[in-house]
Amino acid sequence: KYKPTDATTNPSLILQAKFLEELQNSKKIYNYYKKESVVEHLSESSAKKLEMTEANFRWEMNEDKFAVDAVKLEK
């Protein structure tokens, strides 16, 4: 695609040719993840929704063995 007659006349063409394949691969990755956002995926998935009240939250924190360590680290 790029055919410079001399590398010294236009070295940017050589660099463009080198990175062209890498650019196309990154476009494929971008288009793959652009299809569906994480929020859409989670809202459509069959993930269990949690009903969380303050009392439930405190109970869950007491059940968590590492919650005490987290409080110590915050101080």
UniProtKB/Swiss-Prot annotation:
Protein localization: Cytoplasm
Enzyme class: transferase
EC number: 2.2.1.2
InterPro entries: Transaldolase_AS
Extra remark beyond the main annotation: On the 2D-gel the determined pI of this protein is: 6.8, its MW is: 36.2 kDa.
Function: Transaldolase is important for the balance of metabolites in the pentose-phosphate pathway. May play a role in the conversion of sterols into ecdysteroids via NADPH.
Name used for this protein in its record: Transaldolase
